Amino acid sequence: GESLTMEGGIKANRNPGNRPALDSVHFFTRTMHTYKKIIRYGTDPTGYYWEEVSAGGTHFYYGTLDGSSLDTTAVLRDGSGNVLRWYLRRIQDKWGNYVTYNYAAHNNTSTGNIKSGGKELVLDNIRYTGYGSTPGNYEIVFETSGNRQDARVMMNLGEKILDDRQLNSVKVNYYDNGTPEEVKRFDFHYINGDFDVHPLLEKVVEYRSGEYFYKHSFEYHHSTLSFHGASTLEVSDRNQMLFEDIPNSMSGHRAALFDEYKPSGINTTTTRGGS
């Protein structure tokens, strides 16, 4: 969300005009809190992707897996193919260890409602402890469902983007010889809130290796909606002096405002001296 400036002092959202497109362009934050390098790759809005390098040598890839090409699974596009939003695809430290973020795309195919034709990209799983060609032995999986009760529709990017998924469970897997084994899982159970608008988290149930381990329940205060009779608001008559305390407060300043001071008895003359 912070404003970026292109090398040469050019704002990133300004029309480049006849300036030649470059395959990689460096950007800088307007306020430098710490050093980091921000690089945009690609030559037009349909193929842009980003890389950020911190002072410690950690690489953050947005819309690309490794900084070599656009990854279409990690971007949200409009109908013309222009990229509207880039998602974090990988974090890699200076030693080559990395975490990979995978996403799932959902398109709303319903008809006759405000969500019709909307799209969204949500986090599907995170694979970590990766190195080299090995993606890592640990994985966090996010299971979601659609048609959330308090779904949101956003159109500030020029396209209908939804926030319609409800998180149902978070699962941790360990890959043993390429096969995922469940280590633990957290299931989320919801109830309807007041006015049936917002779902409320009722309980979180934890499982270890597929077996029930523990649960935590939540309780909420539900107040009764009621109405009272009309209240009468009385105001002073408009002819009554509204600032009746002003004369009293001004009386202490009367001497300074109304007393007449006579000129000084000392007269002044002009002299040239010695005459």
Predicted regions and their residues:
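Conserved catalytic cores of ATP-dependent inositol ring kinases
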Residues: G1-S275
